Curated annotation (Swiss-Prot):
Main subcellular localisation: membrane
Source organism: Drosophila melanogaster (Fruit fly)
Keyword ATP-binding: no
Membrane spanning residue stretches: 121-141, 180-200, 217-237, 258-278, 279-299, 750-770, 776-796, 814-834, 849-869, 884-904, 924-944
Protein name, UniProt field: Sodium/calcium exchanger Calx
Documented effect of changing residue 198 to P: Disruption in the ability to maintain electric potential upon stimulation with light
Record-linked SMART domains: Calx_beta (SM00237)
Membrane-topology annotation of the record: Multi-pass membrane protein
Stretches in topological domain Cytoplasmic: 142-179, 238-257, 300-749, 797-813, 870-883, 945-950
Subcellular location: Cell membrane; Cell projection, Rhabdomere membrane
Sequence positions that bind Ca(2+) 4: 455, 516, 518, 520, 550, 552
Name of the coding gene: Calx
């Protein structure tokens, strides 16, 4: 069906073109015949005039009658020729055969007189091909211009907002308001050729009015409103709809887009017919900032708009009071009413939170889809999806469309590369502190800082490490210090010097522990580092703690702390159970988990089992597995218990204790009592709370990635190297956004290669334009608009020569050919936006806004310059209403029909949206819009050639 519509559309254009060309060439042929006939007649008249003037008139009449009889030429033409020869002595009206005038940039194809029809057709074809190539070039440089505009409008500033728990949070928001950007720089970027053509034509014609510039603007407006919206209606996938979100802004731009052409009609035909005064031109130009201001007020709900969401009633005293909020948003999606949540944090903060929630939701979905992928891979895929789904500007879709047409590939590939670089950059920032040790001074410390030894271990080894620069010699002294353990009784005191030759990063020494047979509590002593050599600093731990466990007791068992705080991304967590005050025998300690605020199988895996402490073993670990949900904010806990410890049945100490327990109390010796006291028992900390919090690294990663989720960055370039690489590389224009499962590399299609080599000249030429990263895009902005101006001037000359070669009027060339050439990229951009955007603002809202801006800025600026110039020279700026006035009036009527059709589709229960909807309704609506455009073009052409007179 889409192919059929494209074929019908192409055939309609071809028929219109053939008709206009045939009519023009017919007039050319008739005029050439008249000219030849007149030349012959004039030559005969010149020879006879010396003899008899009366004979001349009679002879002319005879020849006239003879021609009528022999050749069948109309007598009316002969009478006109005779009359004109008598009165003027010259050729017929010069308008019948237009002679081309020299252009502003493009040289004129000579000669201009005595050209055959075949020559004119060849010249017309050459100019037509040149126009197409120029349209491609201006489309490519316009994309550079749009990228610069995107870089300018995406400038951000840091603001501090309060989080849900009154925590301060720094976020970056755009300085430019979206509506203001769309109606100013974005509109200028998408319509720069039309606007500049209007201004350049005024200058090229010595500040006199022309038909090409205004005709292009009016023709482009008609094509945008009718054809682009029609194509977007049927381009929406089956079963989907797209609605305008900012309906207030759409109403403002739609109102001004119609009023703009009503205003043109007023100043052309009503106020001062045929004359544009200075005040009229200036007011036309001032309507541009007024449109932007009004749209901004509507979008921000300022002035009267802030009262439009409230209901009002009159109380008993006759006072108007505000009622309850009606909870209906004009730009809300169709569906159940939702209460409005007012937040002091502002729209930017709410948008940031929404983007963050979307990122986390995507991460959860991807975790379920790819359960074997690690967190970093999931974060990469989530960032790709966030960038792909994030809000995109008109510039993105315009550049995306052009890149596909000229073989430069899909912007989604750049998004994928950007996601990888973003994640790498964020991870590097988060771990930056881990890689800065090389710049620190030389440090020495114990590793580890805590030692637990048995009383009967004999000796144990202590390790001291050096970090930083190890290329020099360094030294440090150490000594033992008493704690609850005393030197000489529990250990052998020691003092010494540790030397670190160049290249050595650690040294070790040994401490001896003294064993005895007396039961005693656990004891500890310390080892201290001091007096480091020059250039060496002592770092923590500079004091090591040594715990001596008695080997005559089975031990006391407990957790090291009552609360353990972990992150959900830890995966496996080892919970330590300590055995102190002895480590004799094999002891079994039961353990189990219990829900608190955390839920088993959701937040953690339940565990139940027994720990077996072998003889002289002082610590064991309970393996706990934490289930990660990638929650941005999480705070839940569960309990871990240890039960009563018991000696292993086959343990030697257990057998001895059983024998002693059989004895009467009065028969127990001192050694028996000590043996009974050595039974294992629990300490105070038998229950530990494990608190699961969100991962701070994950939280920081989310914040940074969401802050970086700006598609604008992929539109710009950072270096000339990147630009020339893009210009010389053929990239496949694949339609898919991402394909994580397909590892096969795609190959560019034949169309990609052909379009690449056709556009290679433009791509290489425009690679010299400065990158957008220079001065925030402003240099690119200035250079691009200059280049667009030069190419637009050439387009103006080529379009004029094209019309002149085929004797087509400038007004027809502008409305039909130039308007189409400048609007084709916008058509493809709107199609992509319609398919991928969630709303219809980038398809419909930008059309009405662009139409209004084109008139107020394009025609207003050009006419202001011309009116001021003529006024300064004491003259008036004359503009013949003619075809422009008729086209404006016709467009206004059809525009109202189109806008009413769009609103009818939105409010109709069976459709409910401007774009998409049921198959039959969307094709009928699109057909109506296509008919409006074809009717508009045909009537304008017929009026231009006086086939119909208004």
């Amino acid at each position: 069906m889409q192919l059929l519509l494209k074929s019908i559309f192409t055939c309609a254009l071809f028929v219109i073109f053939v008709y206009a060309t045939a009519q023009s060439l017919l007039k050319v042929q008739e005029t050439e015949a008249r000219q030849a006939y007149l030349n012959v007649t004039s030559s005969s008249s010149s020879n006879l005039s010396q003899d008899d003037g009366h004979f001349l008139s009679r002879r002319l009449r005879q020849v006239s009658h003879g021609e009528e009889g022999d050749e069948g030429a109309p007598s009316q033409m002969d009478d006109e020729l005779e009359q004109m020869t008598k009165v003027h002595g010259e050729a017929p009206d010069a308008e019948e055969l237009r002679e081309c005038s020299e252009g502003l940039v493009l040289p004129l194809w000579m000669p201009q007189r005595n050209i055959s029809v075949g020559d004119r057709l060849v010249r017309g074809f050459v100019y037509f091909v040149l126009l197409i190539y120029l349209f491609v070039g201006v489309s490519i440089i316009a994309d550079r211009f749009m990228a610069a505009i995107e870089a300018i409008t995406s400038i951000e500033r840091a603001v501090v907002v309060k989080g849900p728990n009154n925590t301060k949070q720094v976020m970056h928001v755009r300085i430019w308001n979206e509506t203001v950007a769309n109606l100013t720089l974005m509109a200028l970027g998408s319509s720069a050729p039309e606007i500049l053509l209007s201004v350049i034509e005024i200058y090229a014609k010595d500040f006199e009015s022309g038909d090409l510039g205004p005709g292009t603007i009016v023709g482009s407006a008609a094509y945008n409103l009718f054809m682009i919206i029609a194509v977007c209606m049927i381009w929406i996938p089956a079963g989907e709809v797209r609605r305008i979100r900012h309906l207030r802004v759409f109403f403002v731009t739609a109102l001004f887009s119609v009023f703009a052409y009503v205003w043109l009609w007023l100043i052309l035909s009503v106020f001062t017919p045929g004359v544009i005064l200075v005040w009229e031109a200036i007011v036309t130009l001032l309507f541009f900032p007024l449109t932007v201001l009004w749209a901004y007020i509507a979008e921000r709900r300022l002035l009267v708009y802030k009262y439009m969401d409230k209901n009002y009633r009159v109380n008993k005293r006759g006072t108007v009071v505000a009622g309850e909020h009606d909870q209906v948003e004009m730009d809300a999606e169709k569906g159940p009413k939702q209460p409005m949540v007012t937040s002091a944090r502002g729209n930017d903060a709410e948008a940031f939170d929404e983007a963050r929630r979307e990122y986390i939701t995507l991460l959860t979905e991807l975790r379920q889809k790819y359960p074997d992928a690690d967190l970093e891979q999931l974060e990469m895929m989530a960032q790709e999806q966030v960038l792909a789904r994030s809000s995109k500007s008109r510039a993105f879709y315009r550049i995306q469309a052009t890149r596909k047409m000229v073989g430069s590939g899909n912007l989604m590939r750049k998004i994928q590369e950007r996601a990888h670089s973003d994640l790498t950059e964020v991870k590097a920032q988060l771990h930056a502190g881990d890689d800065e040790e090389a710049d620190d001074p030389i440090r020495m410390y114990f590793e580890p800082g805590h030692y637990t030894v048995m009383e009967n271990c004999g000796e144990f080894e202590v390790r001291v490490v050096r970090r930083g620069d190890i290329s020099t010699y360094a030294s440090v002294e150490y000594e033992t210090q008493d704690g609850t353990a005393s030197a000489g009784t529990d250990f052998v005191g020691r003092k010494g010097l540790l030397s670190f030759p160049p290249g050595v990063d650690e040294q070790r020494f040994r401490i001896e522990v003294i064993d005895d047979d007396v039961f005693e509590e656990d004891e500890c002593f310390y080892i201290r580092l001091f007096n480091p050599s020059e250039g060496v600093k002592l770092a923590v731990p500079m004091i090591a703690t040594v715990m001596i466990l008695d080997d005559d007791h089975a031990g006391i068992f407990a957790f090291t702390d009552s609360v353990f705080e972990i992150t959900e991304s830890v995966g496996r967590f080892e919970l330590k159970v300590m055995r102190y005050s002895g480590a004799r025998g094999t002891v079994i300690v039961p353990y189990w988990t219990e829900n608190d605020t955390a839920t088993e199988s959701k937040d953690y895996e339940g565990a139940r089992g027994e720990l077996v402490f072998e003889n002289n073993e002082s610590e064991k670990f309970i393996d706990l597995f934490i289930l990660e949900e990638s929650s941005y904010e999480k705070d839940v806990s569960f309990k871990v218990h240890i039960g009563e410890p018991r000696l292993a049945p086959d343990d030697e100490l257990a057998a001895k204790i059983k024998e002693v327990e059989k004895k009467p109390v009065q028969d127990l010796t001192e050694l028996d009592r000590i043996l009974l006291l050595s039974k294992p028992r629990n300490g105070e900390l038998t229950t530990a709370y494990v608190r699961i919090r969100e991962s701070q690294e994950f939280k920081a990663t989310v914040d940074k990635l969401v802050a970086k989720a700006n598609v604008s960055a992929v539109l710009g370039t950072s270096s000339w190297k990147e630009q020339f690489k893009d210009a010389l590389t053929v990239i496949p224009a694949d339609e898919s956004e991402f394909d994580n499962d397909d590892e096969e590399e795609e190959v560019p299609s034949c169309f990609s290669y052909v379009s690449h080599f056709v556009c290679l000249f433009w791509k290489v030429l425009f690679a010299f334009v400065p990158p957008t990263d220079i001065c925030g895009g402003y240099v690119t902005f200035v250079v691009s608009i200059f280049v667009i101006g030069v190419i637009t001037a050439i387009i103006g000359d080529a379009a004029s020569y094209f019309g002149c070669a085929l004797n087509i009027k400038d007004s027809v060339t502008a409305i039909l050919f130039v308007a189409l050439g400048t609007s084709i990229p916008d058509t493809f951009a709107s199609m992509i936006a319609a398919k991928h955007d969630e709303g219809a603002d980038n398809c419909i809202g930008n059309v009405t806004g662009s139409n209004a801006v084109n008139v107020f800025l394009g025609i207003g600026l050009a006419w202001t310059i011309a009116a001021v110039y003529h006024s300064s020279h004491g003259m008036t700026f004359n503009v013949e209403p003619g075809t422009i006035g008729f086209a404006v009036a016709l467009f206004c009527g059809e525009a109202l029909i189109a806008i009413m059709l769009i609103m009818f589709r939105r409010w109709h229960k069976g459709i409910g949206a401007e774009l998409g909807g049921p198959k039959v309704s969307k094709y009928i609506s699109a057909a109506i819009l296509v008919f409006l455009w074809v009717f508009y073009v045909v009537i304008c052409i017929l009026e231009a050639y006086d086939v119909i007179r208004v």
